[in-house]
Amino acid sequence: MQTTQQNAPLKRTMKTRHLIMLSLGGVIGTGLFFNTGYIISTTGAAGTLLAYLIGALVVWLVMQCLGELSVAMPETGAFHVYAARYLGPATGYTVAWLYWLTWTVALGSSFTAAGFCMQYWFPQVPVWVWCVVFCAIIFGLNVISTRFFAEGEFWFSLVKVVTIIAFIILGGAAIFGFIPMQDGSPAPGLSNITAEGWFPHGGLPILMTMVAVNFAFSGTELIGIAAGETENPRKVIPVAIRTTIARLIIFFIGTVFVLAALIPMQQVGVEKSPFVLVFEKVGIPYAADIFNFVILTAILSAANSGLYASGRMLWSLSNERTLPACFARVTKNGVPLTALSVSMLGGVLALFSSVVAPDTVFVALSAISGFAVVAVWLSICASHFVFRRRHLQQGKALSELHYRAPWYPLVPVLGFVLCLVACVGLAFDPAQRIALWCGLPFVALCYGAYFLTQPRNAKQEPEHVAE
């Protein structure tokens, strides 16, 4: 049995390639492979492309804010630490629990999605059986060591990146007739994109699905979580942010274009990945089986990143003395075992969603995760706004910041407003409205819990300035 150490620091073992692939691995998973079908069926092809373009803009704005903060203050559990310092300790506490909720709920939806993938080959085996199997695998990967986790995630993510590139190339060839359709029908060209009109249900569905789009992009902010375990963060983090954003925009927009062009909006949902539907339409032998396996790998990789993130958030809360000290204990390999074990309980959500109408519960779980991650993004933009303002008020030069978000204050303000608009969009979608009914009370509960449990003399977080 591994020994545990009280309040021991986490180890800085991640390199640039680990950080880039960790972020990509967290993003390329359940949201892209399954929720894209829901968005196409709701908004139409052109509406989906527009929604993802807006989502890409939001990600760019948030990551610029996070880049400046995490280079100035590279810490594990970055978001809630920044929020505590610049927005108030109660807000920091709430942000931490929101982000923990984001990834534990995402764990449940990821395991459910993985179960759907396995049912493609084994339709007689219940989804919950696969949930149990994958829970054990993901937990095992996380408890060995941080370096082992990072190496595993690097190769998982590399498989996904190569596959997405291949999908865009093959799908593009099928769109324009270079690869024949399996049923002998002519190449669709751009007909599916324009068949129902540019916006068949108007503009409101785009607003309604923005949280689902943001859920698909969630994971980019893992760069901030891993900053405290990264070698030379001042050099590594800016490179990772620039590289990750560029690749995500290319991968997501290219992938959504191929999906929207090849699948009519009436044929997509969440029971089967639209990616598998595409390769069933294209006459490539065994391509659907191969890609189903890749999707399975991608989803488990995203779950792997999610357990890492949620475990580190509990460790950080304990390290800041807002959770019992047991959560800050780490093994001799620097792994917060107790924090990981508690976070793994999110896998129970997968069992629930696989039993109770996975068609609707899965969408609701994604919406709750989407609400939570957008709320965290709100805090990142607000924290950056206050951080830069105080930096200037203290008479410090901008040149002292080794990574600077451009166009201040436009970037944090616009990022905050767009995230807020996405949350408002939930109120207009009955299928996702549950995110507000669950998310807002959860926020109130966190604030109440903070003021009830934290000593009065600990409620003022000392301000830290960037060195």
From Swiss-Prot:
InterPro entries associated with the record: AA-permease/SLC12A_dom, Amino_acid_permease_CS
Highest taxon of the lineage: Bacteria
Keywords for this entry? Cell inner membrane, Cell membrane, Membrane, Transmembrane, Transmembrane helix, Transport
Q: What GO biological process terms does the UniProt entry carry, in alphabetical order?
A: amino acid transmembrane transport; methionine biosynthetic process; S-methylmethionine transport
Cell compartments where the protein resides? Cell inner membrane
Statement: the UniProt record of this protein carries the keyword Disulfide bond:
no
| Signal peptide start and end residues | none
Question: Where does the chain cross the membrane?
Answer: 20-40, 43-63, 96-116, 125-145, 161-181, 206-226, 245-265, 282-302, 337-357, 361-381, 408-428, 434-454
**How does this protein sit in the membrane?**
Multi-pass membrane protein
Return the Gene3D superfamilies for the record. Answer: Amino acid/polyamine transporter I (1.20.1740.10)
Reply yes or no: does the keyword Lipid metabolism apply: no
Instruction: Please list the GO terms describing molecular function.
Output: amino acid transmembrane transporter activity; S-methylmethionine transmembrane transporter activity
Recorded hits in Pfam families, A to Z, give: AA_permease
PANTHER family noted in UniProt: GABA PERMEASE, GAMMA-AMINOBUTYRIC ACID PERMEASE
Summarizing the function annotation, the protein's role is: Transporter for the intake of S-methylmethionine.
Into which family does the record put it? Belongs to the amino acid-polyamine-organocation (APC) superfamily. Amino acid transporter (AAT) (TC 2.A.3.1) family.
Q: What is this protein called?
A: Probable S-methylmethionine permease
What species was this sequence derived from? Answer: Escherichia coli (strain K12)
